[in-house]
Amino acid sequence: RVFLTEDAQKKLNRDNQSLNLFKSVNVFYKSRKELDNLCGRDEIAHQGLVAEVEQLEEITLKEFIKNNKKQNINLIALEEVTDPRNIGSIIRSAVAFNIDGLIVKERSFPSKSRLLYKSASGGIEHIKIFKVSNLNTSLKFLKTKEFWVSAFDVTAKKDFTKNNWKGKNI
């Protein structure tokens, strides 16, 4: 379902006259105050439009590896990244680079954060999130499945976009 203010509807129609943006979506009109209440005003700014989405299906890292027959699999592992905005930005970038999944520590991943979803700009719907209890153990497991583990550093001399990411990589 999509909730929006009448002002937001007018702006969307004005900016996208040739598109019928909500043709197959249930749209409910609400006041700005009602949208504030839906979002938790202190937590996130809604800009006049709020979408209610279903919870994403979760799969374990082991299930993903077992069922995935692709020759090239690229994953990202995050450690000590806890800010929802930063994680959302990483998710957005990962989707742009066709990354297959994100491995995060279960206890430090802000899965209920609305800021995470907003920062990801819809990207969270296009990537698998693997919540693990121990990142080190998960990386060791992936190495037994022929994954290469690389790390990024701000002082690195090599541009990661120039690397050949064929095969199985983290």
Segments from the language model and where they lie:
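A contiguous loop/helix-start segment that scaffolds small-molecule binding in enzyme catalytic cores
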Residues: N164-I170
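N-terminal positively charged helical leader segments and presequences
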Residues: R1-K69
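RNA substrate-binding interface of SAM-dependent RNA methyltransferases
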Residues: R1-S24, N68-F160
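Short, solvent-exposed coil/turn linker segments
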Residues: S31, T60, A156-N164
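Short, solvent-exposed beta-strand edge segments and adjacent coil->beta transition regions
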Residues: H46-G48, I73, I124, G167
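Residues that scaffold the ATP/ADP-binding catalytic core of kinase and kinase-like folds
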Residues: L38, S119, N163
